[in-house]
Amino acid sequence: MSARLTVRETADFLRTLDNVLILTHVRPDGDTVGCAAALCRALRALGKTAYMLPNPDITETYEPYAAPCWAPEDFVPAAVVSVDIAALNLLPDNALPYKGDICLAIDHHGSQEFFAARTCLDADAAACGEVMYEIVRTLTEVTPDIALALYVAVSTDTGCFVYANTTARTHRIAAALMDV
């Protein structure tokens, strides 16, 4: 059974990690890529070694956010974190070797299957980017690069703020990201 963590507990746990590999889902969208890129940059700001597992399905739209974070082929992680992934069947093929090693899942899907040792879930969030924003700002300063990645995450999963899942909280987070 996965331990449920609050945002604060998640940030505290992330501070204990190093050599982190971050996983995104198949057919990666802006939410999974933006969250992974933001988390990677936040961990690096703390002096941690962190990378994203290269996702073979990424499109040219999202590649610029992810490319600076891609893991080198010889990287051996000490910790594996998934973002915006509700179930293991959403992992790309190259992530399957890590499916039993995921120490933390950060997500917003009510269908979350709690496959990781720990899970930070906010099923009321319109995007995983909302959850990640709260975690990152608890961890470190939100830099312009982090803000841009999180804005991509939030705007993507809300259909540029027109989907019914968009809330006042969504707009407050987007505004805060724009102010960085």
Regions found by a protein language model. Give the residues of each.
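A structured phosphate/pyrophosphate-recognition subdomain
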Residues: 2-26, 38-44, 113-180
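Hydrophobic/aromatic residues located in beta-strands of well-ordered beta-sheets
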Residues: 50-52, 103, 150
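Active-site cofactor/cluster-binding pocket
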Residues: 63-118
